[in-house]
Amino acid sequence: LAQGVMIENIDTHGGFHGDGQSLTVWKFDDNSILEQILTDPDWKELPMTDNLEALLYGVVYDTGLSITEIGPCVDFSEEQLPQIQNGYYYFVDRQAESEMQHSDAQIMERASLNFSIALYDVDTDTLYYIEVDT
């Protein structure tokens, strides 16, 4: 991994069965991490899927007849975890079968969540790493 400076580390794990969430943020002086990201096919260009957007930031669906809010499932502020416009994300569903670990297709159907997601902001050369265990 390219060399970055850790600028934030929050971890609430330690609850029942290790439940909790964590956020670690690294700042890079250049785009050396981007070069590594571009060689890994499991990193996807933003925007994220609707499911991942809901998990991290929450979404509101207004059909005209009803309003449904989903998420977020993390307790980080907009300052700690900003919405990134230009960048890449890497998702691992740690509860899924190994062949489905990079898919979020079934994640909203579960009573508990165990996932990791990395977000890289190309505008600020900042990497955000989030883990959620419920």
List the predicted regions and their residue ranges.
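N-terminal export/targeting and maturation segments
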Residues: 1-50
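Functional cores of ribonucleases/endoribonucleases
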Residues: 43-128
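Short, solvent-exposed aromatic-acidic interface loops
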Residues: 132-134
